[in-house]
Amino acid sequence: MTNKVSLDKSKIKFVLFEGVHQSALDTLHAAGYTNIDYYKKALDGDELKEAIKDVHFIGLRSRTHLTAEMIEAAPKLIAVGCFCIGTNQVDLNAAKARGIPVFNAPFSNTRSVAELVLGEILLLMRNVPQANAEVHRGVWNKSATGSHEVRGKKLGIIGYGHIGSQLSIIAESLGMDVYFYDIENKLPLGNAKQVRSLEELLSSCDVVSLHVPELPSTKNLMNVARIAQLKQGAILINAARGTVVDIDALAQALKDGKLQGAAIDVFPVEPASINEEFISPLREFDNVILTPHIGGSTAEAQENIGFEVAGKFVKYSDNGSTLSSVNFPEVSLPEHEGTKRLLHIHENRPGILNKLNQIFVEANLNIAAQYLQTDPKIGYVVVDVETNDASPLLTKLKEIDGTIRARVLY
């Protein structure tokens, strides 16, 4: 089915920051979107405002920050895509208040992060980071002391989501006994076992790997008290969010010999560029693997992320689908022949849907299909109407008190 969109695709403007993968450009081009500005780096301040002032879609990774002020500087903005898992670089509430859905890629780098963590487990269990550092310094310290196979060791996973469960599968294939803690009851994969308390997991596992989102409840999840609950000689890995581990508490535990080692890929404060020095008390420890937030930085993951997020842009632009948006009611309505599609985003208050439908009743028009979803703050309705001219309808929809945004899609 082919429909004439309300705005020619050549006039719909995209801007992509931070060198997102070519697959994103390919996906947009294949769908007919060619008006794309592309930046290999993050922008901020007035430079960012200038770059986004006339755009409809913004694509970014983790270093471009869309604050409420920046969102206001983009009056034509329709949607935002985070070409990564995290969305804390975007003011989600400010975007919602403007009727702007935000999309991300919660699945595409799952395998890459899980593989990095597994590799770190193998290296730390064999004391490879220390051995590597010593040999670089000319020290030939051939020893089996403290070096272990992973087979039969207990892996504790905190957060059994996409990455945590993927790690569970591949770790078990190497013979590890997998335990996990999650605030929700989850179906264990393979022979993994869910424990009922965080304390039980921390005190019993040889390796603990963190896979939780950045929330107020997870800030400094691994603090002095929790680190003290770890087994003597345990290994701690964080490839989740930088605020989850109290870095000073971890450094002290390493100084005290509490842990065999650690691997940290994310930090509370990270350099903005390669020209800025990375500062951390963890730099002094040979038994700590430090990586610059590269958990999802593989060619395969970045390619998949490009396809996934750009694909969500296309669906929202073409048919209004908001499936998997992180800040918006999820709506997807199949297309219907011989109709015009209108989108209406409004404050979630009583009577708005009734007023909306009354407009079609007064125009003596049949609604071929309608889909409404709400969250506590906003409602989003997609309407397919049997008419040849939707312009008068759009004018009336915009006049409804409580309307945030309304437009004719096609």
Curated annotation (Swiss-Prot):
Keyword line: Amino-acid biosynthesis, NAD, Oxidoreductase, Serine biosynthesis
EC number: 1.1.1.95, 1.1.1.399
Recorded superkingdom: Bacteria
ACT domain mapped to chain residues: 341-410
Record's catalysed reaction(s): (2R)-3-phosphoglycerate + NAD(+) = 3-phosphooxypyruvate + NADH + H(+); (R)-2-hydroxyglutarate + NAD(+) = 2-oxoglutarate + NADH + H(+)
Matching Pfam families: 2-Hacid_dh, 2-Hacid_dh_C, ACT_AHAS_ss
Activity regulation comment: In bacteria displays feedback inhibition by L-serine.
PROSITE patterns registered for this protein in UniProt: ACT (PS51671), D_2_HYDROXYACID_DH_1 (PS00065), D_2_HYDROXYACID_DH_2 (PS00670), D_2_HYDROXYACID_DH_3 (PS00671)
Active-site residues annotated for this sequence: R241, E270, H293 (proton donor)
Enzyme class, spelled out: oxidoreductase
Pathway of action: Amino-acid biosynthesis; L-serine biosynthesis; L-serine from 3-phospho-D-glycerate: step 1/3
GO molecular function: NAD binding; phosphoglycerate dehydrogenase activity
Binding-site list for NAD(+): H162, I163, D182, A239, A240, R241, D265, H293, I294, G295, G296
Family named by the database record: Belongs to the D-isomer specific 2-hydroxyacid dehydrogenase family.
NCBIfam families named in the record: PRK11790.1
Function in brief: Catalyzes the reversible oxidation of 3-phospho-D-glycerate to 3-phosphonooxypyruvate, the first step of the phosphorylated L-serine biosynthesis pathway. Also catalyzes the reversible oxidation of 2-hydroxyglutarate to 2-oxoglutarate.
Protein name as it appears in the record: D-3-phosphoglycerate dehydrogenase
Source organism: Haemophilus influenzae (strain ATCC 51907 / DSM 11121 / KW20 / Rd)
